[in-house]
């Protein structure tokens, strides 16, 4: 059934919004995995876990915001399977933050591509929506993660090879306590 409210909302944009919803849900799922990995008793970096769990919630909220847009514009939400995170064991904070940065850059590129599609289809409402709710936040988050990576590389020292879960170094512990503290 076609929507009675649909106006200036192309099927290409509608499909791209559905793909972006899926990317946000996949990011949320990955951050949830990261968050609870770092909260495990054998990892015990609660601040890192909290940081990633907050990101999981933000990405889920972003998916919901996109779904609301889809309904407001007369589009139809088509849910797709959400891909599981690429791994279950995340190692050290440095490797996890690198994976998170790559994920955010991928998500940002998808947002930029959708914005370009909206511009090409003369959809100012979509472009304004993305600019107001997503693009600036993404750039700030990418910068924040880049800063965290710089500091993690500064404090990382050579680690002896271990079996099982990599143990946090003193530098990683201090980064977690001083940078990602939460109350």
From Swiss-Prot:
The keyword Iron applies. Keywords: Cytoplasm, Cytoplasmic vesicle, Iron, Iron storage, Lysosome, Metal-binding. In rat liver, the light chain is the major chain. One of its GO terms (molecular function) is iron ion binding. One of its GO terms (biological process) is intracellular iron ion homeostasis. Fe cation binds at residues 54, 57-58, 61, 64. It is found in: Cytoplasmic vesicle, Autophagosome; Cytoplasm; Autolysosome. Its main location: cytoplasm. PROSITE patterns: FERRITIN_1, FERRITIN_2, FERRITIN_LIKE. InterPro entries: Ferritin, Ferritin-like, Ferritin-like_diiron, Ferritin-like_SF, Ferritin_CS, Ferritin_DPS_dom. Pfam families: Ferritin. It comes from the Eukaryota. Residues 7-156 form the Ferritin-like diiron domain. GO terms for cellular component: autolysosome; autophagosome; cytoplasm; cytoplasmic vesicle; ferritin complex. The rat light chain has an octopeptide insertion after residue 158 compared with other light chains. Belongs to the ferritin family. Oligomer of 24 subunits. There are two types of subunits: L (light) chain and H (heavy) chain. The major chain can be light or heavy, depending on the species and tissue type. The functional molecule forms a roughly spherical shell with a diameter of 12 nm and contains a central cavity into which the insoluble mineral iron core is deposited. Interacts with NCOA4. Stores iron in a soluble, non-toxic, readily available form. Important for iron homeostasis. Iron is taken up in the ferrous form and deposited as ferric hydroxides after oxidation. Also plays a role in delivery of iron to cells. Mediates iron uptake in capsule cells of the developing kidney. Delivery to lysosomes by the cargo receptor NCOA4 for autophagic degradation and release or iron. This is Ferritin light chain 1.
């Amino acid at each position: 059934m076609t929507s009675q409210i649909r106006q200036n909302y192309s099927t290409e944009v509608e499909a791209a919004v559905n793909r972006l919803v899926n990317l946000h849900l996949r990011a949320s799922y990955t951050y949830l995995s990261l968050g609870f990995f770092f909260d495990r008793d054998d990892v015990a970096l609660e601040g890192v876990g909290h940081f990633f769990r907050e990101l999981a919630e933000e990405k889920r909220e972003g998916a919901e915001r996109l779904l609301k847009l889809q309904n407001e514009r007369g589009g139809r939400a088509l849910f797709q399977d959400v891909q599981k995170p690429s791994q279950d064991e995340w190692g050290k904070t440095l490797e996890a933050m690198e994976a998170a940065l790559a994920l955010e850059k991928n998500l940002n590129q998808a947002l930029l591509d959708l914005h370009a599609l909206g511009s090409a289809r003369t959809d100012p409402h979509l472009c304004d929506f993305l600019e107001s709710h997503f693009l600036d936040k993404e750039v700030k988050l990418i910068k924040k993660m880049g800063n965290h990576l710089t500091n993690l590389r500064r404090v990382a020292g050579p680690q002896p090879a271990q079996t099982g879960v990599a143990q946090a170094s003193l530098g990683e512990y201090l980064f977690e306590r001083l940078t990602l503290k939460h109350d």
